[in-house]
Regions:
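Active-site-adjacent structural elements that line small-molecule/cofactor binding pockets in enzymes
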Residues: 1-275
Length: 275
């Protein structure tokens, strides 16, 4: 399986420069996660791998509706031939609100994984975006493991129980480095409230115990505090470690601060100490 390290960094695909990738590698982050449904050709992945020496690159996630499995598999093999073991293929079903052809996502995921099998993409080199129990079980059975997004440590604990002890559990969590909670929540709102209209995320948040009132835009203080780690650097790291304590192997930081690199520099030594 691709070595991810304990902590990684999430940005939309195209969001990392080569210089930033090299600095994040030097700072000790283990993986660069490319979000926003990158196309099947996986542009930018090779550039980041070429610019660095050891850090891994992963997708979070390739959308099964828009990226044909055959083309994705070809991209995977091309990358793995040049940079063996350093790329993890994360895939997922996206959102019904965003996809005109949306069918039952579970069936489409199974078909997609079948195609990746036929194309020779190893189980241990792919992972699946998963929130609910059924897709979490599929992730454990058919891939290296699960990539939950917009979740709490309580979800992480339940996901680990479903996946068992051996499957990968790499969890995204948002970060704002600000000791003023009102200001931190305001910074977080644009990157949280979008998901409150998406029923798969809203349903998962309800499963985690949030009420309808919490999910009214822009989201309650209780919801924002649970989904976004904010405060001092020490407090933020402690909040991220709650996912590790709950069973995560890897925590993916999505930094919402205007100067995200400054935040990542500040957090890096504390994250290293926690490992």
């Amino acid at each position: 399986m691709t070595e991810l390290g304990r902590f990684g960094v999430w940005r939309a695909h195209g969001g990392f420069t080569s210089e930033e990738a090299r600095e994040l590698e030097r700072l000790g982050y283990g993986t660069l996660w490319l979000g926003g449904s990158p196309p099947a050709e996986l542009p930018g992945v090779a550039e980041l791998l070429a610019a660095t020496e050891t850090i891994s690159v992963a997708t979070s996630i390739v959308n099964v509706w828009s990226a044909p499995a055959k083309e994705v598999a070809e991209s995977f093999h091309r990358l793995d031939a040049r940079y063996p073991g350093r790329f993890l293929l994360g895939i997922g079903a996206g959102h019904p609100e965003m996809t005109g052809e949306y069918r039952k996502p579970y069936e489409v995921l199974v078909e997609y994984l079948d195609e990746l099998d036929r194309a020779g993409v190893p189980k241990e080199r792919r992972a699946l975006a998963a929130l609910g129990p059924r897709v979490l079980r599929l992730a454990g059975d058919r891939t290296a493991g699960a990539l939950p997004y917009l979740v709490t440590p309580d979800h992480t604990r339940g996901a680990r129980e479903i996946l068992g002890p051996d499957a990968l559990l790499a969890v995204e969590h948002k970060v704002v480095l600000d000791t003023d909670p009102v200001r931190a929540r305001a910074q977080a709102i644009p990157r949280v409230e979008f998901y409150l209209d998406l029923r798969n995320y809203a349903s998962n948040l309800r499963r985690l115990g949030f009420q309808d009132a919490d999910l009214v835009k822009p989201g309650s203080a209780r919801l924002l505090d649970a989904l976004v780690a904010h405060g001092s650097a020490k407090s933020v790291v402690e909040q991220l470690i709650h996912h590790i304590d709950a069973g995560a192997d890897h925590v993916v930081l999505q930094v919402l601060d205007d100067d995200s690199m400054a935040t990542l520099r500040t957090l890096a030594p504390l994250l290293h100490e926690s490992s």
